[in-house]
Swiss-Prot record:
Core subunit of the mitochondrial membrane respiratory chain NADH dehydrogenase (Complex I) that is believed to belong to the minimal assembly required for catalysis. Complex I functions in the transfer of electrons from NADH to the respiratory chain. The immediate electron acceptor for the enzyme is believed to be ubiquinone. This is NADH-ubiquinone oxidoreductase chain 4L. GO terms for cellular component: mitochondrial membrane. GO terms for molecular function: NADH dehydrogenase (ubiquinone) activity. It comes from Mytilus edulis. The lineage of its organism: Eukaryota, Metazoa, Spiralia, Lophotrochozoa, Mollusca. Gene3D superfamilies: 1.10.287.3510.
């Protein structure tokens, strides 16, 4: 069980690193969010082993977040032509 705690904390910290350091592309931000939600799932599994419904709820929320991120990525790609954060922040003039 100790390795699952370590893996959860490692995934959450790697997700934070990806979000704060590799934020040039929108896809990198979404991958960082997914890593953080996977780390949260591991940590929740360690601390709440008897509460299987809560683990399923967190997993369901992570899947919903991933589908919303994918829809946003497709929408941004259609509107701007790329997934660079600089193209989202420019005013277009």
């Amino acid at each position: 069980m100790v390795w699952m705690k370590f893996l959860g904390v490692l995934l959450m910290s790697m997700g934070c690193f990806v979000i704060f350091r590799m934020n040039k592309h929108l896809l990198c931000l979404f991958v960082g969010l997914e890593m953080m939600s996977l780390g949260l799932l591991f940590v929740t599994h360690v601390f709440l082993m008897n509460q299987f419904w809560l683990i399923l709820l967190i997993l369901c929320l992570a899947v919903c977040e991933a589908s919303i991120c994918l829809a946003l990525l497709v929408m941004v790609m259609r509107l701007c032509g790329d997934d660079l954060m600089s193209s989202l922040l420019s005013d277009g003039s």
